[in-house]
Amino acid sequence: MGPCETCHAGCCRSFAVPLTGADILRIERELRLDFWQFACRWADPHGKIARNHAPHFRFSDDPRTPFVVCLMHAESHFLDGTTKCRFLMECAPDESHSRGVARCGIYGSRPGACRAFPMALDDTGELVVLRDVPPRGRVGHDPAYELCPRPWEPADVDPLFAVQDLVVVAHEMSFFRRLAEVWNRRPQSWLVFPDFLRLVYANRVLRQRGEPVEFDDEFVPAFGSDEESLRSAA
C-alpha cells in the first residue's frame, strides 16, 4: 500500500501548486474548465513558492510584485480553518482516520508538480531520486498540514512512468520559464494572461523552414504592446 492510500493529503493542503502553461491548457481541454475556475496568481516576494523552479510573472496592475501561477485553494469542508487544493476531494474523518482520507479529483489531468512529488531526477537525468519529505508543509501545529504518513520507498514509485513524468515536467517548466521572460519584458494585465498562454501554445508546433526558430518576442508574432492586441490575437 502506497503512502497516499490512507492519507488526508497534507501536501494538497499545504502547498500552492505551481502550474505550467501545458498544465493549464490540459485542465481546460480535458475537464472543460475555464482558466478562471482553477488558476490564480500567488504573490511570492520571497520566492518561497517558486523555489528557484517555477517562474515569476509580473503584471501591469502590480508590477513590483512577483507572482507564481498556481492552482486555487478553497476552504476545507471538514478540517475547520484550513485550506486545500480546489480539486481535492475530502472524506469525513472517522475512527480510523482522524483527518479523513482525501483523493485528487483530477488525477489523470493533475499538474506536473503533483506528478513529480516527492521525486527528482539525479544529476545524469536518468535516475529517479526520492526526496526526503518534511513532517509538515506549513509552520504551526495544525495537523491538517502534516505530510506523508510514512517515508517513501523505491517500491512506491513506478520505474517507468516516474522517469517519463519527471522528464516532461522538467521540459515544460523550462519552456514556461522562457515564456515568462518574454512576458516580463512587457508585462500586461493579469486579465489577458490566459489569452497570451493560448496564443503561445497555439504557435508551439511549427514547420521547419531553414534556420531554427528562437524563442523570443518573434515566437509570438501577434503579441503586441497593448491588451487589445492580445485579445484580438487569441
Question: Where in the sequence are the language-model features?
Answer:
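Short loop/turn segments that flank or connect secondary-structure elements
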Residues: M1-A234
